[in-house]
């Protein structure tokens, strides 16, 4: 049977990947998946995660 609860799987995508124009780096998009509790966190998640394409920590925002 499926789990019941308020936890939902969300995808986080880097916000700086599209705006960066560094020619030495590839134009890949960094994405992470995580879970959040919809009851406690109603707004969109925004976390600092490592982006391997830019080789540094960047802000990742929740996408639909």
UniProtKB/Swiss-Prot annotation:
A Pfam family recorded for this sequence: Ribosomal_L33
Entry GO MF terms: structural constituent of ribosome
Cystine residue pairs: none
Region (Disordered) location: 16-42
Gene Ontology CC annotations of this record: cytoplasm; ribonucleoprotein complex; ribosome
Keywords for the protein's UniProt record, in alphabetical order: Ribonucleoprotein, Ribosomal protein
Keyword Ribosomal protein among record annotations: yes
GO BP terms in the entry: translation
Residue stretches of biased makeup (Basic and acidic residues): 16-25, 33-42
Ribosomal protein keyword on record: yes
Database matches in NCBIfam families: PRK00504.1, PRK00595.1, rpmG_bact
Family: Belongs to the bacterial ribosomal protein bL33 family.
Protein name as annotated: Large ribosomal subunit protein bL33
Native source species: Prochlorococcus marinus (strain MIT 9301)
Lineage of source species: Bacteria, Bacillati, Cyanobacteriota, Cyanophyceae, Synechococcales
């Amino acid at each position: 049977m499926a789990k019941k609860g308020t936890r939902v799987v969300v995808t986080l995508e880097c916000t700086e990947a599209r705006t960066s124009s560094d020619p030495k780096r590839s134009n890949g998009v960094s994405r992470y998946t995580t879970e959040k509790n919809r009851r406690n966190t109603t707004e969109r998640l925004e976390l600092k995660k490592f982006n391997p394409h830019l080789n540094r920590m960047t802000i990742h925002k929740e996408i639909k």
